[in-house]
Amino acid sequence: KGNKLGLSKIAYNFLGGVLNCTQPLSAFFNPTINSYRRINAPPTKSGATWSPSTISYSGNNRTHMIRIPDPGRFELRLMDGATNPYLLQAGVIAAGLEGINKRMDPGEPIMVNMYTHEKDYPNLNKLPNELEEALQYLDDNKELKEAFGESVIKSYIKLKNQEITSFN
């Protein structure tokens, strides 16, 4: 049985898993140093950044990381064009299945403009501020290490750290 946003209980559990793993998944979703410049961009003159900075969800509201525009589906708005599509999909599926298996509750949707009301929600988890922080979250996450295999995660982190060193 769904609710006013039109998702089933299982879909909410899936959503809960994705929200729970967002910080480590950010290493896949936003795999470059410049990715975090987009996430942490200051608001434009219009008052929007068009990029989420908090781990939150809502209805048809683009100011949140996840929006539910229509019954039966949700849109994950975090990743950028540099993401590896295979790691992205595998990460979302792994996190979502973890949410289903553990019956994770995503909490209530936040039905406000997060660009103007973010300060009203100081307890919301924030997205990582830089790639190094996202990689640390990934390295600390046992669920994704189990889903991908520890050697895959370690190799990915090593590669990204080499890219960071080359960039600097």
Which residue ranges define each predicted feature?
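Acidic, glycine-enriched catalytic cores built around paired aspartates
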Residues: V112-N168
